[in-house]
Every structure is written in structure tokens, then in C-alpha cells.
């Protein structure tokens, strides 16, 4: 798991993409130019949550270490401490794996 000193605000999360296989089950090697960006990742930081209508803090459903699925174009790509990461809102996450 990547370590970062970045703390997201509100309902944002920091996600590290999980790299896809470089070879198919049939043994065909996939070149970097043909690979799609993986839509699966691991959460490495979460914000405190959002506020409801009464001002109470509502915590996020995801936590650090969760493996999640998200849309192919979700989030903003950033590089922190030399690591490529995504910052996205919790609403961009489709679900938790496992």
C-alpha cells in the first residue's frame, strides 16, 4: 500500500490503481499502448465525510485498504511522492470488492 501525507477534504478519496495483467490467459502479451486504464484500485486515504442538512458529519462508506471499482474516466490524476494516484469523490466509486 502506498503511503502519502495528503489528506483529502470532504467526501474525496485517494485511490491507487491496481495494475492489470500484462499477459492474457492464452499467453498473449499485451503491449502498454493497448492496455486500458484499470478501473479498479485501492483506497489509500479518505476525507472526513460530508455534512447533512443539520450540519452533522456523515462519514464515508469506504475506508483505507478497500479495493474498489470506479468509472474509467473517474477522478483527477495526480502524482504524489512519485506515485500516480487518483483523487475522486466517493460518489464516483461503484462498489467495494470483497
Swiss-Prot record:
GO biological process: chaperone cofactor-dependent protein refolding
Gene Ontology cellular component terms for the protein in this record: cytoplasm
InterPro entries: Chaperonin_GroES (IPR020818), Chaperonin_GroES_sf (IPR037124), Chaprnonin_Cpn10_CS (IPR018369), GroES-like_sf (IPR011032)
PROSITE patterns, alphabetized: CHAPERONINS_CPN10 (PS00681)
Keywords from the UniProt entry: Chaperone, Cytoplasm
S-S bridge residues: none
Main location class: cytoplasm
One Gene Ontology term of the molecular function aspect: metal ion binding
NCBIfam families (alphabetical): PRK00364.1-2 (NF001527), PRK00364.1-5 (NF001529), PRK00364.2-2 (NF001531), PRK00364.2-4 (NF001533), PRK00364.2-5 (NF001534)
Subunit details: Heptamer of 7 subunits arranged in a ring. Interacts with the chaperonin GroEL.
Protein's name in the database: Co-chaperonin GroES
The gene coding this protein: groES
